[in-house]
Amino acid sequence: PEILKLTDIYGVRAGVIAVYPMYRGLARLVGMQVVKAGDTVADEFTALEKSFGQFDFFFVHIKKTDSYGEDGNFDGKMHVIEEVDRELPRLLALQPDVIVVTGDHSTPAACKAHSWHPVPVLLWSKWCRPDDAKGFSERECRFGGLGHIRAAELMPLMMGYAERLAKFGA
């Protein structure tokens, strides 16, 4: 079957920064260019900074949160999330139009496996309206302005908040 490219669908030049080969391969399949990065979260953010002007859209995948969840290593998973939190000011300094933080699935350390639990989504743009969420977690996201959305709705929302849609809705 023909697989459409992100450029054809959304008109964006897209880059991927990912340690895990499967994500790089899938990204290539949909027309994204792989940006070389080292193995650490800091390395991935450095690669993002260095290549920021070359792309309209980035997918940055942090694998260790998933790996630690599968191992049942709550502390390890927590430390990786804290590492991402420490690196976020570097992303904010680049002044992107939209930032999305989410996961491709839940991997609770207590389950030691991928699970059926909903995945929290944080979407930020200067066009976002304030909501009642006070943090970013599975529980706190129920107070967020996005509500419960399907994954297929995320890219059009991102494009809308980046002011890159010709029209939203019917």
What are these regions, as identified by a protein language model?
Residues 1-170:
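Feature captures the catalytic ectodomains and active-site-proximal regions of enzymes
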